[in-house]
């Protein structure tokens, strides 16, 4: 005879709150200080991320660590000529390039989008999300700091928003609960054994 249904996980929630940033000094490291997501072209649709550790591929295109293209305000890619002398990214997301001839060029602008319900985004791995019915559609791309989006910090990365103190506390509480339940089972077994012995 089975008594009870055991235990199972309910929901797994993702915390979308902002966290502290850490300076890296690297031009392609970008952190959103506030609400918002970068738009990413995965090849089979648009995804969204807050992870701003970007790179340049062999064609000079701005990509994620997995090689997905980072999109600009207009939904296009951002490309730095491979022979450019230098480039910078401003806090407004604008990419400025000094080409091989020493001339300044506009490299486009990184846009940030927001959602009515970020908690409703679907996780697809590699710190990427897709919009869902629960999240609503993404807003139009905004310049960082506009339209309710957070500002852009260049040369910084957002750290984990996990509170280790809270997590350790919850783990200890769960461990104590498990130990108490184990003790109850042991005591119940002992009582049943005593009853069996009395019957004999």
Language-model region placement:
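Amphipathic alpha-helical polymerization modules
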Residues: 1-200
